[in-house]
């Protein structure tokens, strides 16, 4: 069985964060992201970045305070991803839990305030 529902992509958000560099570091450590692009403002501050996670790209914009977004991401092993995210500096929102909706899901909050919901499909809905 696939680790995600047929036709789903892993992730496709645009996040506004206070610190693009810190978010990219977290995405690499927690989810194995690969940096794709980084654009700067005329004063040299980061303006926009892109990173690939699995089969998808997450885009980041730098904005003071960020937006506190929530992102759902399908992963092959939610327990391993949860552990990697905590090791990368995230705080736990929810330990991996099967709530009967077909997914095993955990929740972590990164240093920029984004809450990530890594999930692995347990059964076809």
Map each language-model feature to its residues.
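A short beta-turn/loop motif at secondary-structure boundaries
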Residues: 41-44, 65, 99-100
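Short, solvent-exposed beta-strand edge segments and adjacent coil->beta transition regions
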Residues: 8-12, 66-70
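Short amphipathic alpha-helices within nucleic acid-binding modules
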Residues: 25-26, 79-84
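Short hydrophobic/aromatic beta-strand micro-patches
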Residues: 14-16, 72-76
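Vicinal oxygen chelate
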Residues: 1-6, 36, 47, 59, ...
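Core segments of cupin and vicinal oxygen chelate
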Residues: 3-8, 14-57
């Amino acid at each position: 069985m696939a680790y995600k529902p047929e036709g789903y992509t892993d992730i496709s958000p645009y996040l506004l964060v206070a610190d693009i560099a810190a978010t990219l570091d977290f995405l690499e450590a927690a989810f194995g992201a690969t940096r794709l692009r980084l654009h700067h403002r005329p004063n040299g501050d980061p303006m926009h970045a892109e990173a690939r996670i699995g089969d998808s790209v997450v885009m980041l914009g730098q904005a003071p305070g960020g937006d506190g977004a929530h992102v759902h991401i399908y992963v092959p092993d939610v327990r391993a991803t949860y552990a990697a995210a905590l090791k990368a500096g995230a705080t736990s929102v929810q330990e991996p839990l099967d709530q009967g909706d077909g997914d095993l899901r955990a929740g972590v909050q990164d240093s920029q305030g984004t809450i990530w919901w890594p999930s692995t499909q347990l059964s076809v809905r």
